From Swiss-Prot:
GO molecular function, one term: 4 iron, 4 sulfur cluster binding
Cofactors required: [4Fe-4S] cluster
Subunit structure of this chain's protein: Heterodimer of LeuC and LeuD.
Species in which this protein is naturally found: Pyrococcus furiosus (strain ATCC 43587 / DSM 3638 / JCM 8422 / Vc1)
Name listed for the protein in its UniProt record: 3-isopropylmalate dehydratase large subunit 1
Native organism taxonomy: Archaea, Methanobacteriati, Methanobacteriota, Thermococci, Thermococcales
Chain segments annotated as transmembrane: none
Length: 424
């Protein structure tokens, strides 16, 4: 038997096999699954069509009403009501709305509902976030979610793995958001199509678990099936006291076969900005800051960069500063816990004094939902993960993706800017 990657080991175990090979199709037991207010209603309708009366296990399913909540209109309210009634009927334990809801990919790891070594599916494309914990986590359609809710299983084609190795010392102001943007800029939005992106190297080891989540979150933006990072002491420390189930640690074998290995010297990487209308359109900040690109709005938040460390970064730049005239700065902590801790640390005070609007935990403007939609001709710098045409509003608006540092600096100067221009 040849060596296997961490992703292959997780799939093999959950499929009840000793080994799997790329290209093989397996039926595997799923540890945890979830949907949101956009994807759950269709899954429920499909579940009804299957004709099963009860979900396979109400403790292994979550419904997180995070996209259009607090309800933005009647349709959103009806979607949430439909999902809520199903959760009550089925006795689904992990149902989140109102004061306990957070952006799903922040909330579920925080609560210990997704764990190392697990096989996780979610009816949301950024489910790959949990790969930061050493899980095989991937987005599925509502139909696959419905079948999994009924059976506890899902089918997978075993993907090949690309190993990314990051070495060297990070420059000032460079974050994991810059690393993943640089990577996508290098390989392209199809560069890891249906592959696993395995992130490794001394730089990844030094990143916090929250920073790692930013990287795995955006694996899908390179076309990947998922992103994954081997668990280490930091991972175990993160899940300690949170874990709702027992879990198992997997690591890639020394002789594991990779589709390819890509190495980066991070000392040459500076903060990145992804220009419209693809995350691969990356430009280093030294160049972007000189282009005098005026902006109308800045959004700091989302499942990519709405965690406590991200808000601390923003506060580091915003403290004692004011948002530029005619610029709207919207900050969305990604969970109630993050919101509460940001308040305790005085971050919210810094944001309010700077002239920011602080909203509740919601996906909101990231997908053009609400709480920060762009008009025709408007430009935004955002810490979110996608900048497709019309992603955050009007088809003739523009979205520039960046880290919390760059986003905060841009809000202050009213144009795409480097934090070095603000923090002396």
């Amino acid at each position: 038997m040849g060596g296997m990657t961490i992703a292959e080991k997780i799939l093999a175990t959950h499929a009840g096999k000793e080994e799997v090979k790329p290209g093989e199709i397996v039926l595997a037991k799923v540890d945890f699954m979830f949907g949101n207010d956009v994807t759950t209603p269709l899954a429920i309708k499909t579940f009804r069509k299957i004709g099963v009366e009860k979900v396979f296990d109400p403790e292994r399913i979550a419904i997180v009403l995070d996209h259009f909540t607090p309800n933005k209109d009647i349709k959103a309210a009806e979607q949430c009501k439909f999902s809520r009634e199903f959760a009550r009927e089925q006795g689904i334990k992990w149902f989140f709305e109102g004061g306990n809801v957070g952006v799903e990919h922040c909330l579920l790891p925080e609560l210990g509902l997704v764990l190392p070594g697990e096989l996780i599916i979610g009816a949301d494309s950024h489910t790959c976030t949990y790969g930061a914990l050493g899980a095989f986590a991937t987005g599925v359609g509502s139909t696959d979610l419905a079948v999994a809710m009924a059976t506890g299983e899902a089918w997978f084609r075993v993907p090949e793995t690309i190993k990314f190795v990051y070495e060297g010392d990070l420059q000032p102001w460079v974050t994991s958001k810059d690393l993943i943007l640089y990577t996508i800029g290098d390989i392209g939005v199809n560069g890891a199509l249906y592959k696993v992106m395995e992130f490794s190297g001394e730089v990844i080891e030094k990143l916090s678990v929250e920073q790692r989540m930013t990287m795995t979150n955006m694996a899908i933006e390179a076309g990947a099936k998922t992103g994954i990072i081997e668990p280490d002491k930091k991972t175990i420390e993160y899940v300690k006291g949170r874990a709702k189930r027992e879990y198992k640690i997997y690591k890639s074998d020394e002789d594991a076969k990779y589709y390819k290995v890509i190495e980066y010297d991070v000392s040459k990487i500076e903060p990145q900005v992804a220009f419209p209308h693809l995350p691969e359109n990356t430009v280093p900040i030294s160049k972007a800051a000189k282009m005098n690109i005026k902006i109308d709005q800045v959004v700091i938040g989302s499942c990519t960069n709405g965690r406590l460390e991200d808000l601390r970064m923003a506060a580091e730049v915003l403290e004692g500063q004011k948002v530029a005239p005619w610029v709207r700065l919207i900050i969305l902590p990604c969970s109630p816990t993050v919101y509460f801790k940001a308040m305790k640390e005085g971050l919210l005070e810094i944001f309010l004094e700077a002239g920011a609007v602080i909203g509740p935990p919601t996906c909101g403007p990231c997908l053009g939902g609400h709480m920060g939609i762009l008009a025709s001709g408007e430009r935004a710098v955002s810490t979110t993960n996608r900048n497709f045409v019309g992603r955050m509003g009007h088809p003739k608006s523009e979205v520039y993706l960046a880290s919390p540092y760059v986003a905060a600096a841009s809000a202050i100067l009213g144009r795409i800017a480097s934090p070095e221009e603000v923090v002396k």
